[in-house]
Design a protein with these regions (language model features):
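Non-cysteine beta-strand/loop elements that form the S-adenosyl-L-methionine
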Residues: 36-43, 108-118
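Active-site-proximal loop/helix segment associated with metal-binding centers of metalloenzymes
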Residues: 119-134
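An N-terminally biased module of ancient metal coordination in phosphate/nucleic-acid-related enzymes
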Residues: 1-93, 98, 102-103
Length: 134
């Protein structure tokens, strides 16, 4: 079959704490498989209050380094693959304004929806977790 774009826009890094390998390893594996576009979309950091630290996402402080690292690799591999950097995000109203400002400030390429929590990670159930609700 021809005419289809070989791309992946849902790639996590070690910063989300549940992915393994380096960005470089992901890029080189994608190139070997004929992928022409690769998007990195770590879970968007949340400006949690009260010192809460997520086990599934980077901190707000890690976001600039994440974007910088992907941009630098994009320059290095420009002749082999097109790289994009963005975030996978839930829509949580209490965080959205600050997250959108960070996204704009860092010059990210895209954001994908991944609504894993119905409320904040701190206060709502994970959508894949069984509950006692009827």
């Amino acid at each position: 079959m021809t005419g289809f774009l070989k791309a992946n826009y849902h790639t996590h890094t070690y910063r989300c704490q549940h992915a393994y390998g380096s960005e470089r390893e992901y890029i080189e594996a994608a190139i070997r498989r004929g992928i022409t576009e690769l998007g990195f979309s770590d879970h968007v950091p949340c400006p949690f209050k009260d010192g809460y630290v997520s086990g599934i996402r980077m901190t707000m402080e890690q976001a600039p380094e994440y974007v910088y690292a992907i941009r630098e690799l994009g320059k290095e591999y420009a002749s082999d693959i097109k790289l994009y950097v963005g975030f996978e995000a839930e829509y949580i109203p209490e965080f959205f304004k600050e997250q959108k400002a960070m996204f704009d400030r860092l010059g990210c390429d895209y954001m994908i929806m991944g609504q894993h929590f119905m409320k904040s990670e701190q206060t709502g159930p994970y959508t894949g977790t069984p509950t006692d609700d009827e």
